[in-house]
């Protein structure tokens, strides 16, 4: 049974209306010719009744009437006019008329802030305000700031262009404008952050030029980024800001009071002891972080307040609370304020005294807020009564046709608006005031005495470097105390490695093997300390962003922060050494002399500081953490290689000996060795005497040695000499001086890098790598000093709204396109009859039925928008027979018709979604009242008995205050929850969801997780390839993708890489791409989680306009959570589900035309909306706790919103619909028999192509790995160049192979960051049903092999031949060695992949990887030969994956080799003694047979092929764990 749609309108309903827009933002090629109303404005008044009647008739004819409050996005208008009056002539004609001031805007301050003059905050401000405070008078005249284009230095870009304005105390000025308009540049100019050489014009503060030395002390600059120390509490964050920026005279009690007042003001008192938090540390909410950002900006007090988007991410009530308090600060604290906002409500806008509208660096209006509407009305632009004036101000310059009641509009481009403003009375008045007050004080009541910062000669900082260092140290130790787990980790690691090394080298003897093992132990002790401090690279990057932010705001000098950072880092190193050093020292039986033990401990502490300083230097000089790790790892490897252990000094060629001397680890190793070996005697066990007692050696001299044996090394000095260490004992103290010089050098470089570099700024720039062929990128403005083409530039390319393009030329270009059939006639009302002041058009598909057209109205052809009409040439369209209509005006009569052109993917209908008694709860830990020390589990109810439905073609808005459960409900409906307790019923087309439901639904998440290396079109095409069924041909699929790109207005950027946030597409573009990716699956139901969050009104409108097209044009079911929607956006929705705190329904039903249904409902409850109030904001007040409404007798009574709704007629009607037959009898329900639309092989091919391109488009990673391989190959090859068959060459061959495998381990660490980044994309896509997880994993692994293998090949081939390794017969040894290296690189790549997949984050994966590589080095068989391992550690040796490639390559190399001692070089002299008399000296050559030499390491020739099997075994284990991790592990919960 069909039910009456609550949105059906009667004959008394207002006309369905839409403002027409010639918006170049939508490149839809839809040249339309509108009626010229120059002669018909008066006639339209007489036709209103006819229009109303026709409007009603059309509603009853299944939406034959195209009526959309936002149809201007789909149509572009073309105006023909002979009237070429200039803008100022039009203004002159209106001079005698009413000024157009609106009695409802701005809202009076007394109404917004009752009793604001006498509340507690105002009193406190007045009491604490210094008596002599006057604030800053800002005088800016003809200011222009020009920079050179980053790529083309000859091109100069004006970021601001000849702007003039003034600011004075006690007034707030609002800046509005689209991204790239110049807002940030003005803020930087007033904050003194721009370079004078690029600035032209006059800028005065209190009549004086800017003094860069101390100007910042007069201002408070609140940035839009919430950058704070995550481990500090809210109170500590405020106190630190006040300590740094506050006046020196403030006492401790005054500071406490100031901090408390600030927290109370911002509503943060209850959270004062909660840490701020970040992505890894749980803390306060995002809205609270924004309040903290505002608080630290204003806490010092200032004479000028600059705030850049301070309410971004906050709900409307919180935003108003904060800015109303700012208003009090400004009014009663005598500080002027300049503030920019994204989507301000009418209440927020009314708080401001003045308005500045910017567009592309030029002022389009500057004047009183209460005169702004009248100014634009005189120009022919009117703000509809139901619209927020702030939206009107933001959009009128970019979309003048939308608001013009004079056609064609005389201001068509921003240049026209600038010209109109320059010709207006406002500009003339401004110039007169500035001419009359050239002293820079534009005020009728000038103060007698003004603050002069230049005269006071204030310092740059309020406090000296000593005090700054003190408070930075205090903060640093607080951070350390909060990060106690880092201390515990280092302590645990120290104890673990101390016990490991101590027991592994348990009680080493002072014999020959003990002497060699001590060298290995000392080397590994050094390496352990070095790698422990190396984690500072990652941690320092986390701190660096906060430092850059606070340095820019002049919290402290770089030196103060730097000194405190060094001091605060010392305890952690000392603590680790305090546990690690004694354990390993005494267990391993190192020299039991107290002074040597003290030296050992001091040198380890010095080593820790050296490594820490080196790691910080690498982090400070590197733009990204990846580059820092590459630089640090390469240098570290080279320094360790030349430290004297792997390659002793005597074995290093003269061309590389300089690396031995500049390596700081050389001197650490020498210091440890000298301390351990000097003045120590060594002996031999019987088995260590040389030559061994073999029959050959027992023969009498000269055939043998006559049984004579010697102990090769009898003193520590002899052992050191074998390693090239010849310095005396006192030199170990010189080592401290050498290391101190290194530490100072590293810290000095780090200090200057921090002082003069700011890599975070450079990250925000984006160089456009590729545009569509033949697409010319025009020079754009940006609010960045470097003027690189940034995401703002991409916005302008995307918008294609070039100010310099001639308006009429564009119209002519559009006319030249192929004409399409005449299908629409437009009836234009007279502007005088419009209560809203905006042009309204009735668009009727029946050309023969023109309501009230009259004889003066011309019929014109209107081209059908390309995105609304079926394509003649394409077999697939995304179009529907129903036109785009405003949701609130739509009758929602859906059609399942198919395109006549064939398979019409986009015309398939949506699904009916219904939910009944839906509840959701989670288990949380709370304090146990019976035992305060324990926690108990308690169930927290987040959603309670939620009912509702959505039909195809409808848009349902989920709204409510923060914490009401909007996103929770969306996740439950989309079945994205991974935990919690869900009860109730969800029905899709009358049936419960199944495992195949992913085929018909799509979820656009709030965080736009997209593959960064794909282009826009590739991302959408990939989704289509994986998620469309095989019945769709390639041509059809490609056509479908092209249509999506067109509808989403992504054509101009479709060939650009997506990138990452801040270094790629803008937020708005990423949002539309995300929608396109989900739309490519041809879903029947589309879920969107806050798609407008973080966008300005223009971008938010674009996104929701696209969603509206999806719902109406494609007849889809759309459910969307929205946060602070504008009136224009709110109009798009058909239904509203409003939740209150606790997740309970307080309204579910239709919105109606211009929100008439819900506003009527509110009116019946005693809530009456005033003009210019956003209906969305007004409706949200239903959810206010303790809401008071007007009772029957005019009295104020409390409102129970939930009870009122369930007793209302709307509720009864909605439940009748839900309980009745919601789904029509003729509705066709699709059925599926597979979870995935495409086959495994199709998914695999698509994934292989994407993964391959992704790796190719990250050339920096691959090229850096290749360069590193080549450099290390040349370095190691020439270090061991053309090895011969002498004694030292035998050891050198083993060292070369061992170190080569260590370098292979770098592949594992280097791939972790990329894999973790890709993992987020995988989680989103596999949850959405893109593909099988096995298809992804297989493609990811296989496509990595060419890059991994090429890295290994580029290393081993040059190394092998330069070093002169044995190639064997027919180069068989070379090919075997190459094969071993290839599979070893694959094994390490699989190891890194396994850790990146199975561990929660990059930091932990890198840490575990480093520990794993360290342990593999220790047990691999080189540092300690297998025969020398304690029996308890044999299992570690056999489990070590490094053992097998090392054994395989070494046995391959040494098989069949014979070594000699030419000229007794390397031989051991054996005195021949007979009858107690030495008769001769005979030399013994220790290493003669390669196979025997391998046995000393425990390596066996017969194991070579078993080793290959073991390597493959590890590859399968790591890859298998990776498959399991991808399939089973999800490091996030919903």
Swiss-Prot record:
Polar residues composition-biased segments: 830-841, 864-873
Which positions, given as ranges, span the membrane?
Answer: 486-506, 521-541, 566-586, 592-612, 625-645, 652-672, 734-754, 1261-1281, 1296-1316, 1345-1365, 1377-1397, 1404-1424, 1506-1526
Ranges annotated as biased composition (Basic and acidic residues) = 1-11, 897-906
Per the record, its GO cellular-component terms are: membrane
Annotated GO MF terms? ABC-type transporter activity; ATP binding; ATP hydrolysis activity; ATPase-coupled transmembrane transporter activity
> What GO biological process, any one, is recorded here?
sorocarp morphogenesis
Report the record's disulfide bonds. Answer: none
Q: Which stretches are tagged as biased composition: Low complexity?
A: 21-65, 842-856, 874-896
Please, which domain of life does this record's source organism belong to?
Eukaryota
Key word NAD present: no
Q: What is its main location?
A: membrane
Q: Where is this region: Disordered?
A: 1-85, 781-907
Q: Does the keyword Membrane apply?
A: yes
Q: Please name the SUPFAM superfamilies in this protein's record.
A: P-loop containing nucleoside triphosphate hydrolases
Q: Which residues form the ABC transporter domain?
A: 138-385, 924-1166
What is the membrane topology here? Multi-pass membrane protein
CDD domains to which the protein is assigned, alphabetical: ABCG_PDR_domain2
Biased composition regions of type Acidic residues, renumbered to the chain: 797-808
Which InterPro entries would you find in this protein's record?
A: AAA+_ATPase, ABC2_TM, ABC_transporter-like_ATP-bd, ABC_transporter-like_CS, ABCG_dom, ABCG_PDR_2, P-loop_NTPase, PDR_assoc
> Residues in domain ABC transmembrane type-2?
481-757, 1256-1529
**Keyword vocabulary terms for this entry:** ATP-binding, Membrane, Nucleotide-binding, Repeat, Transmembrane, Transmembrane helix, Transport
Q: Which residues bind ATP 1?
A: 177-184
List where in the cell it is found.
Membrane
As for family, the record states: Belongs to the ABC transporter superfamily. ABCG family. PDR (TC 3.A.1.205) subfamily.
Enumerate the PANTHER family for this protein: ATP-BINDING CASSETTE TRANSPORTER
What is this protein called in UniProt? ABC transporter G family member 6
High-level lineage: Eukaryota, Amoebozoa, Evosea, Eumycetozoa, Dictyostelia
């Amino acid at each position: 049974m069909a039910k009456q749609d609550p949105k059906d309108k009667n004959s008394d309903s207002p006309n369905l209306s839409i403002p027409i827009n010639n918006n170049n933002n939508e490149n839809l090629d839809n040249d339309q010719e509108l009626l010229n109303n120059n002669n018909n404005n008066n006639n339209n008044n007489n036709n209103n009744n006819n229009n109303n009647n026709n409007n009603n008739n059309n509603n009853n004819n299944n939406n034959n009437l195209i009526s959309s409050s936002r149809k201007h996005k789909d149509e572009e208008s073309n105006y023909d006019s002979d009237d070429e009056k200039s803008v100022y002539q039009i203004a002159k004609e209106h001079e005698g008329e009413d000024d157009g001031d609106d009695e409802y805007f701005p809202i009076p301050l007394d109404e917004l802030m009752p009793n604001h003059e006498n509340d507690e905050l105002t009193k406190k401000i007045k009491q604490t305000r210094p008596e002599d405070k006057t604030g800053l008078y800002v005088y800016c005249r003809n200011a222009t700031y020009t920079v050179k284009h980053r790529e083309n230095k000859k091109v100069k870009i004006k970021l601001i262009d000849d702007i003039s304005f003034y600011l004075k105390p006690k007034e707030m000025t609002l800046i509005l404008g689209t991204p790239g308009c110049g807002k940030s540049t003005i803020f930087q100019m007033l904050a003194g952050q721009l370079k004078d050489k690029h600035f032209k014009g006059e800028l005065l503060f209190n009549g004086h030029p800017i003094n860069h030395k101390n100007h910042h002390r007069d201002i408070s600059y609140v940035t839009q980024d919430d950058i704070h120390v995550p481990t500090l509490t809210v109170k500590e964050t405020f106190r630190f800001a006040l300590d740094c920026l506050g006046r020196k005279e403030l006492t401790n009690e005054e500071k406490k009071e100031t901090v408390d007042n600030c927290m109370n003001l911002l509503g943060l008192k209850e959270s004062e002891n909660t840490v701020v938090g970040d992505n890894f540390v749980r803390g306060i909410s995002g809205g609270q972080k924004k309040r903290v950002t505002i608080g630290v900006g204003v806490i010092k007090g200032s004479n000028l307040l600059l705030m850049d988007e301070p309410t971004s991410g906050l709900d409307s009530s919180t935003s108003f609370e904060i800015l109303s308090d700012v208003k009090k600060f400004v009014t009663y604290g005598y500080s002027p304020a300049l503030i920019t906002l994204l989507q301000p409500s009418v209440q927020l806008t009314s708080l401001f005294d003045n308005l500045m509208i910017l567009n592309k660096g030029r002022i389009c209006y500057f004047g009183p807020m209460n005169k702004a509407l009248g100014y634009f009305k005189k120009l022919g632009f009117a703000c509809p009564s139901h619209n927020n004036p702030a939206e009107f101000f933001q959009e009128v310059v970019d979309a003048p046709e939308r608001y013009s009641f004079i056609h064609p509009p005389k201001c068509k481009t921003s240049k026209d608006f600038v010209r109109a403003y320059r010709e207006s009375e406002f500009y003339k008045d401004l110039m007169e005031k500035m001419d009359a007050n050239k002293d820079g004080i534009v005020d009728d009541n000038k103060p007698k005495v003004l603050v002069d910062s230049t005269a006071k000669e204030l310092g740059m900082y309020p406090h000296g470097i000593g005090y700054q260092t003190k408070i930075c140290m205090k903060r640093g130790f607080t951070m350390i105390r909060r990060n106690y787990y880092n201390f515990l980790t280092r302590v645990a690691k120290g104890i673990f490695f101390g016990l490991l090394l101590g027991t592994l080298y348990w009680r080493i003897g002072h014999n020959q093997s003990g002497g060699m093992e001590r060298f290995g132990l000392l080397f590994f002790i050094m390496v352990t300390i070095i790698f422990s401090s190396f984690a500072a690279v990652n941690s320092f990057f986390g701190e660096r962003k906060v430092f850059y932010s606070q340095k820019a705001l002049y919290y402290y000098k770089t030196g103060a922060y730097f000194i405190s950072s060094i001091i605060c880092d010392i305890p952690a190193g000392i603590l680790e050494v305090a546990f690690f050093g004694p354990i390993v020292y005494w267990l391993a039986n190192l020299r039991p002399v107290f002074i040597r033990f003290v030296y050992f401990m001091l040198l380890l502490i010095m080593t820790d500081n050296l490594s820490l300083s080196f790691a910080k230097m690498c982090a400070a000089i590197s733009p990204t953490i990846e580059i820092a790790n590459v630089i640090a790892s390469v240098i570290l490897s080279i320094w360790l290689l030349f430290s004297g252990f792997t390659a002793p000094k005597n074995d290093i060629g003269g061309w590389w000996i300089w690396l031995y001397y500049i390596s700081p680890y050389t001197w650490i190793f020498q210091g440890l060795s000298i301390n351990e070996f000097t003045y120590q005697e060594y002996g031999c066990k019987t088995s260590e005497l040389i030559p061994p007692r073999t029959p050959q050696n027992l023969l009498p001299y000269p055939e043998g040695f006559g049984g004579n044996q010697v102990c090769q090394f009898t003193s520590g000095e002899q052992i050191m000499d074998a390693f090239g260490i010849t310095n005396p004992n006192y030199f170990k103290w010189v080592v401290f001086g050498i290391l101190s010089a290194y530490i100072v050098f590293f810290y000095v470089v780090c200090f200057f890098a921090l002082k003069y570099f700011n890599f975070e700024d450079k990250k925000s720039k984006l160089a456009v790598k590729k545009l569509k062929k033949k697409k010319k990128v025009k020079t754009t403005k940006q609010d960045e000093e470097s003027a690189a083409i940034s995401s703002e530039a991409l916005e302008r390319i995307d918008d294609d709204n070039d100010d310099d393009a001639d308006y009429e030329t564009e119209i002519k270009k559009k006319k030249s396109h192929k004409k399409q059939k005449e299908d629409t006639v437009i009836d234009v009302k007279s502007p005088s009859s419009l209560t809203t002041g905006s042009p309204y058009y009735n668009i009727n598909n029946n050309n023969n039925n023109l309501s009230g057209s009259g004889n003066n109205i011309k019929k014109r052809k209107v081209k059908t928008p390309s995105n609304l009409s079926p394509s003649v040439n394409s077999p697939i369209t995304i179009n529907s027979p129903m036109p785009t209509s405003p949701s609130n005006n739509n009758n929602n009569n859906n059609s399942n018709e198919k395109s006549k052109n064939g398979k019409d993917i986009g015309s398939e209908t949506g699904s009916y979604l219904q939910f009944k008694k839906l509840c959701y709860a989670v288990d949380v830990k709370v304090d146990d009242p019976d035992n305060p020390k324990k926690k108990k589990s308690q169930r927290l109810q987040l959603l309670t008995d939620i009912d509702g439905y959505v039909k195809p073609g409808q848009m349902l808005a989920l709204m409510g205050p923060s914490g009401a459960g909007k996103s929770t409900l969306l996740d439950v409906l989309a079945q994205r929850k991974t935990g919690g307790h869900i009860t109730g019923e969800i029905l899709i087309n009358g049936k419960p969801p199944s495992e195949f439901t992913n085929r018909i639904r799509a979820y656009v998440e709030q965080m736009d997780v997209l593959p960064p290396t794909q282009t826009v079109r590739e991302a959408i095409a990939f989704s289509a390839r994986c998620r469309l069924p095989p019945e769709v041909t390639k041509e059809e699929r490609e056509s479908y993708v092209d249509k999506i790109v067109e509808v989403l207005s992504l054509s101009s950027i479709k060939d650009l890489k997506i990138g990452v946030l801040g270094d790629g597409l803008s937020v708005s573009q990423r949002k539309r791409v995300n929608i396109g990716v989900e739309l490519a699956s041809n879903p029947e139901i589309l879920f969107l989680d806050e798609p407008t969050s973080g966008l300005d009104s223009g971008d938010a409108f674009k996104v929701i306009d696209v969603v509206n097209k999806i719902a109406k044009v494609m007849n889809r079911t759309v459910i969307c959570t929205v946060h602070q929607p504008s009136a224009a956006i709110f109009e798009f929705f058909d239904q509203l589900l409003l939740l209150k705190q606790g997740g309970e329904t307080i309204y579910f039903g239709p919105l109606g035309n211009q929100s008439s249904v819900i506003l009527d409902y509110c009116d019946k409850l005693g809530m009456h909306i005033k003009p210019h109030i956003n209906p969305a904001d007004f409706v949200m007040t239903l959810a206010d706790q303790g809401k008071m409404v007007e009772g029957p007798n005019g009295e104020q009574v409390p409102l129970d919103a939930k009870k009122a709704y369930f007793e209302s007629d709307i509720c009864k009607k909605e439940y009748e619909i839900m309980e009745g037959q919601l789904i029509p009898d003729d509705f066709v329900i699709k059925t599926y028999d597979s979870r995935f639309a495409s086959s495994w092989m199709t998914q695999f091919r698509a994934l292989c192509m994407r993964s391959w391109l992704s790796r190719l488009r990250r050339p920096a990673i691959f090229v850096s790995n290749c360069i590193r391989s080549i450099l290390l190959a040349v370095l190691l090859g020439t270090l061991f160049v053309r090895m011969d068959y002498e004694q030292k060459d035998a050891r050198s061959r083993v060292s070369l192979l061992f170190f080569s495998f260590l370098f292979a381990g770098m592949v594992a660490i280097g791939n972790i960051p990329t894999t973790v980044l890709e993992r987020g994309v995988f989680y989103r896509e596999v949850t959405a049903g893109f593909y099988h997880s096995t298809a992804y994993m297989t493609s990811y692994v296989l496509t990595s092999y060419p890059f991994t293998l090429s890295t290994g090949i580029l290393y081993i081939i040059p190394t092998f031949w330069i070093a002169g390794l044995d190639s064997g017969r027919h180069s068989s040894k070379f090919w075997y060695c190459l094969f071993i290296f290839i599979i070893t690189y694959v094994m390490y790549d699989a190891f890194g992949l396994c850790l990146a997949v199975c561990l929660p984050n990059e930091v932990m994966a890198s840490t575990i990887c480093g520990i794993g590589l360290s342990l593999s080095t220790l047990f691999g068989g080189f540092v300690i030969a297998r025969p020398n391992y304690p029996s308890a550690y044999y299992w570690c040796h056999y489990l070590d994956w490094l053992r097998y490639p090392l054994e395989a390559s070494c046995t391959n190399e040494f098989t069949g080799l014979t070594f000699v001692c030419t000229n007794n070089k390397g031989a051991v002299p054996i005195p021949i003694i007979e009858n107690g008399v030495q008769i001769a000296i005979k030399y013994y050559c220790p290493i003669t047979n390669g196979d025997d030499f391998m046995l000393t390491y425990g390596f066996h020739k017969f194991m070579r092929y078993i080793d290959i099997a073991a390597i493959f075994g590890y590859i399968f284990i790591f890859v298998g764990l990776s498959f399991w991790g991808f399939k089973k592990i999800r490091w996030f919960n919903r």
